[in-house]
Regions:
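Acidic beta-strand-to-loop metal/phosphate-binding motif
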Residues: 72, 76-84, 361-363
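Conserved "right-hand" nucleotidyltransferase catalytic core of DNA-directed polymerases
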Residues: 1-55, 79, 116, 145-344, ...
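Conserved catalytic core of nucleic-acid polymerases
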Residues: 200-203, 309-312, 316-317, 321-324, ...
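Short, basic/hydrophobic alpha-helical segments
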Residues: 6, 10, 58-76
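Short alpha-helix plus adjacent loop in nuclease-associated cores
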Residues: 46-63, 102-165
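C-terminal polymerase-core module
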Residues: 222-229, 233-285, 453-501, 505, ...
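Short active-site loop/helix that positions an aromatic residue
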Residues: 27, 36, 85-96, 106-113, ...
Length: 588
């Protein structure tokens, strides 16, 4: 006990502190906290909290821990961590709140090297400081069946202390690197303040109607059984629809349907192939229905209820702040960003994400944000005009591309224009367009040529951004986010062409990601500032989902539209569509 007080007193005299909090798993919100290391003023301390072996030290009482450390963790002195969000989750389980200022060296490193997946502290320290840290003594055990809780305190302390001690110097080095790379404003104004926002969202979670999921599971299972019966009838015998080998035998040997695409392992039975074969025989269509139901049932309907936290009846995802090289957030355990929405069946899954009694879900979604960013970058007069006057941009594109009046545009022409508008920024080729629209490549090339003839500004920008990427070896977003492009000059044509497509879509997708992150900051601050009974729960691509008291829905809706539309100053206005309801499906 005296040792804890002495450590807290010594750290209180240090100008800045390094902090590492260690758990026994990969889920900071729920795993067992093994211990924490603190370092400052040339001294490092390790506090064992969850070691479980014969002779292990007793866990410190929570009240004692809070009394000694909360003044430090909640004070004005910088407390640096490698992944502050994970550290804050684990500290909260000990009754501690990390609100002190400080850097997140993991996040800083990810901004500097966005294409690298992992940024372990040992590698970042070696790269930025030339300093070797001791290896994790439990790494081998954690890959097997063991864990950190069984490791002896001395071994963990010898590793944990240097990890905490390196953080102040590492934070300084990374801050200098961010300045040199012109990334400091993005880190300081967007990424670092977003950490506590995401922390709050992960803690909040979203309510799920497990009874509705259970009913859906039974219904989907019965529908799959009926489809299996019809498949058996169509084939003339039972077969395993999930086996590509058995399915291929039925399709191509027994039914003698044409082989459309060949793989090394045999004829393909992918979605594209089955859709074409369904025009000739009912069995492929039944397979598609069965696959769709199996995917929905296995991935969502049956899996999601198992992830509901029994303590609050809610699902808590984990957001990766730098989950993609473009800067987009990603969601894991579970991934709530890919909950399907296109079909009526998949919308029923969203209907199981609900608000508690007396509350509503409010969804706010940017309208065509990537197209608006393309208009901003390209300064194409036709695109700019479409967004400034608020006309249907796909109808305008169809009219321009096919040379007809807007009132004469057919649904098929608008569909082609929509594919063009969303595909051009991703390097859509004539072959790709022909595949999507089931037309000859020559006809598709003609459509693309007519598009670029009418939208010359877009073509010029596409060419200029690739040229700039080749010259600078990098591309940036409107907010300055960096993505290195080393393969833009590769000799291998496939690598080079892929890099050229990335050079085009990164400024657009990355700027959209930045806009959404700024919007999250603005919405979070505004909700707190106006003291509304509401909290942000999810970010899904260009959409924010907020849970609000019924009486606050109108104010929250207006706040979302106001703050989100003001999150960036582009050459065209940002527009946000807002809805609300008892479920996510009703709200969006």
């Amino acid at each position: 006990m005296r040792g804890l007080a002495a450590a807290a007193a010594a750290l209180g005299q240090a100008p800045e502190v390094g902090l590492m909090v260690f758990g026994d798993g990969e889920s900071p919100r729920t795993d067992l906290v093994i211990g924490l290391a603190l370092a400052g003023g040339g001294r490092a301390y390790y506090l064992p909290l969850g070691h479980r072996y014969l002779g292990a030290p007793a866990t410190l009482p929570a009240a004692l821990l809070a009394g000694a450390l909360q003044p430090l963790l909640g004070g004005r002195k910088p407390v640096h961590a490698h992944d502050r969000k994970a550290a804050a989750h684990r500290l909260a389980r000990l009754g501690l709140e990390l609100t002190a200022p400080g850097e997140d060296t993991d996040l800083m490193s990810r901004l500097l090297v966005p294409t690298r997946r992992e940024h372990p502290l040992s590698e970042v320290a070696r790269e930025r400081l030339g300093q070797a840290l001791p290896p994790d003594p439990t790494e081998g055990a954690r890959r097997g069946t063991g864990g950190r809780e069984g490791a002896e305190v001395e071994g963990i302390a010898a590793w944990a202390g240097p990890e905490a001690a390196v953080l102040p110097a590492l934070a300084e080095a990374l801050a200098g690197a961010l300045e040199a790379a012109r990334l400091a404003p993005l880190y300081r104004d967007v990424e670092r303040p977003l950490v506590p926002v995401l922390l709050d969202m992960e803690r909040a979670g979203i309510a799920v109607d497990s009874a509705a999921m259970g009913a859906m599971s039974a219904e989907f299972g019965a529908a799959m059984d009926e489809l299996t019966r019809r498949l058996t009838e169509a084939a003339g015998h039972p077969f395993n629809v999930a086996s590509t080998r058995e399915l291929g035998k039925v399709l191509f040997e027994e039914l003698r349907l044409p082989v459309i695409k060949k793989l090394k392992t045999g004829p393909s039975t992918d979605v594209e192939v089955l859709e074409k074969l369904a025009e000739q025989h009912p069995l492929p269509g039944l397979v598609l229905e069965h696959r769709s139901l199996a995917k929905l049932k296995g991935t969502y309907v049956d899996a999601l209820p198992l992830l509901i936290d029994p303590a609050d009846g809610r699902i808590h995802t984990t957001f990766h702040q730098a989950g993609a090289a473009t800067g987009r957030l990603s969601s894991v355990d579970p991934n709530l960003q890919n909950i399907p929405v296109r079909t009526e069946l998949s919308r029923r899954i969203r209907a199981a994400f609900v608000a508690p009694p007396g509350r509503r879900l409010v969804s706010a979604d940017y309208s065509q944000i990537e197209l608006r960013i393309l208009a901003h970058y390209s300064a194409d007069p036709a695109l700019l005009e479409s967004f400034r006057i608020g006309e249907d941009v796909h109808t305008r594109t169809a009219a321009e591309t096919f040379g007809v009046a807007a009132a004469a545009v057919t649904p098929d022409q608008r569909r082609v224009a929509k594919v063009l508008n969303f595909g051009i920024a991703y390097g859509l080729s004539a072959f790709g367009l022909s595949q999507r629209l089931d037309m000859p490549p020559r006809e598709a090339q003609g459509i693309i040529d007519r598009y670029f003839a009418r939208y010359a500004g877009v073509k010029r920008w596409l060419e200029s951004i690739v040229a700039e990427a080749r010259r600078a070896g990098e591309v940036r977003t409107v907010f300055g986010r960096l993505r290195p492009m080393p393969e833009i000059t590769a000799r291998n044509p496939a690598l080079r062409q892929a890099a050229e497509r990335t050079a085009v879509n990164t400024p657009i997708q990355g700027t959209a990601a930045d806009v959404v992150k700024v919007a999250m900051l603005k919405v979070h601050r505004a909700l707190a500032g106006e003291r509304l009974d509401a909290r942000m729960l999810l970010q899904v691509h260009d959409e924010l989902v907020v849970e609000a008291a019924e009486g606050a829905v109108e104010k929250v809706s207006a706040l979302l539209r106001r703050e989100m539309e003001a999150s960036a100053s582009l050459a065209v206005p940002l527009r946000v569509e807002v809805g609300h309801g008892r479920s996510w499906a009703e709200a969006h």
